[in-house]
Structure formats: C-alpha cells, structure tokens
C-alpha cells in the first residue's frame, strides 16, 4: 500500500468544538492511519504553543501550525517563523493611524504587547488565555519579531 499523508484541523474535527477534548472517533481514526504507516499531521492557524498539548493528547507527532509558519516533525520544532516584518509593520501603522486597537504577539506564547488599551476598550478581552503587556512607550518599529497581530476593526469598516 502507498503511504498517504493526512492533515487534520483541530477544532470540530479532532476535538469537540465546545470542550476541546479529542473525540473518540478521531483517536480511533488516527491510530488506524498510523498503524497502516500513513503520515498524520495537524494543520492549523493556531500558534505552536496552543497546539502542542493537543497534538500530544491525540498521539500526533507532526504539525503545521501558526498559519503555516511553524513546522514540527517527529515532535521536533523545525521552524517557527515570524511574519514578514515590513509587511507586518505597515499593517500595524495603518491600523494605528485609523484608531484601531492593536495587540501584537512578539513570541510564541500567551503574551501580547500593546501601547494602549484601545483593543480591550473596542472589543473586550480575548476569549483565550492572554497575558496583556501594556507598554505606553512601545515603538512598533523597535519590534524585532512579530508572530501575530490582532486588530479591533469595527463591523462598519
């Protein structure tokens, strides 16, 4: 039999969308595929730090996470690249000029930096665990790495 490659999303596919717990049918399917020698991986937009524990629960050792920027092969982190810095800064500056609240993940963790509290004022706190780091002297151009950008864009914009 030819080896096949299977990539699965997490929420609502491998785990219950409400609880985040792996569904029994997913665990059974993953095991069957792996036992037959197929390559099984997770493909998700989630950051790596939010994906690795779920992968471990599912017995999956390969991941494409962080929207394709992170690659984990046989439980080893191969790469986890930040966004293109110049494009990210252009987006951040445009959002800032328009008065939109901004949160920036500068590493692969629950930490986000912000220069003011506009994001929280405009849309409230994020629904997932987040540590907000308020730095009123934050100069976006001084940021070395940018992994994710969260922008509070009003519905009418």
Regions found by a protein language model. Give the residues of each.
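Active-site phosphate-binding/coordination module
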Residues: 27-121
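A general structural motif
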Residues: 1-3, 37, 99, 144-146
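Short, flexible loop segments at the rims of nucleotide/cofactor-binding pockets, characterized by
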Residues: 17-20, 40-41, 80-81, 128
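Conserved acidic, metal-coordinating active-site core of Asp-based
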Residues: 94, 100, 105-157
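Asp-based phosphoryl-transfer active-site loop
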Residues: 2-19, 42, 91
